[in-house]
């Protein structure tokens, strides 16, 4: 993902999380991802991660938990709520097919990638990307859609995890 798009994407996620779920705070930031955490109890931490896809103008969201304040790196694909840790891509909570849902800032570019690759192989030029000023207005609606999906799929998962860990009341900031 191009740097200006990624910067705007993360700013939008910061704003949306602060507005919707202020209990999440930045946990760590890596080259292609940013993670927020919420210590729901002394023995349960929830995480939300936004990961940009390398070489594409796309991103995905992950939800995870751990009984200690460490990111559960080895828990991908584990969503048994009674487990000490779990981690899954948000899109996998509603989609089970071979294609994983991602959010695409430039779907027209994604659609033409095969043609662009063929053009490069043949020594032809490829269309330039839109200017950032035309891309920027697309970002917040995608972030809001991702946060709506988080509210509809991620938060209910976190509630089930909390209940399985003996937490009877989980104030999510939207209650």
List PLM regions with ranges.
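Intrinsically disordered, low-complexity regulatory regions enriched in serine/threonine/proline
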Residues: 1-14, 27-175
């Amino acid at each position: 993902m191009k740097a200006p798009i990624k910067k705007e994407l993360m700013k939008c996620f910061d704003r949306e999380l602060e507005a919707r779920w202020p209990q999440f705070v930045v946990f760590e930031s890596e080259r292609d991802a940013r993670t927020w955490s919420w210590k729901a109890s002394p023995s349960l931490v929830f995480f939300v991660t936004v990961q940009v896809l390398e070489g594409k103008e796309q991103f995905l969201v992950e939800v995870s938990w751990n009984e200690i304040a460490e990111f559960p790196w080895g828990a991908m694909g584990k969503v048994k709520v009674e487990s000490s840790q779990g981690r899954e891509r948000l899109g996998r909570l509603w989609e089970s097919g071979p294609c994983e849902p991602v959010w695409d800032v430039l779907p027209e570019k994604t659609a033409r990638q095969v043609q662009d690759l063929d053009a490069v192989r043949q020594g032809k030029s490829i269309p330039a990307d839109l200017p950032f000023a035309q891309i920027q207005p697309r970002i917040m609606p995608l972030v809001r859609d991702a946060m709506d999906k988080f509210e509809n799929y991620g938060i209910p998962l976190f509630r089930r995890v909390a209940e399985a860990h003996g937490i009877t009341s989980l104030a999510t900031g939207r209650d």
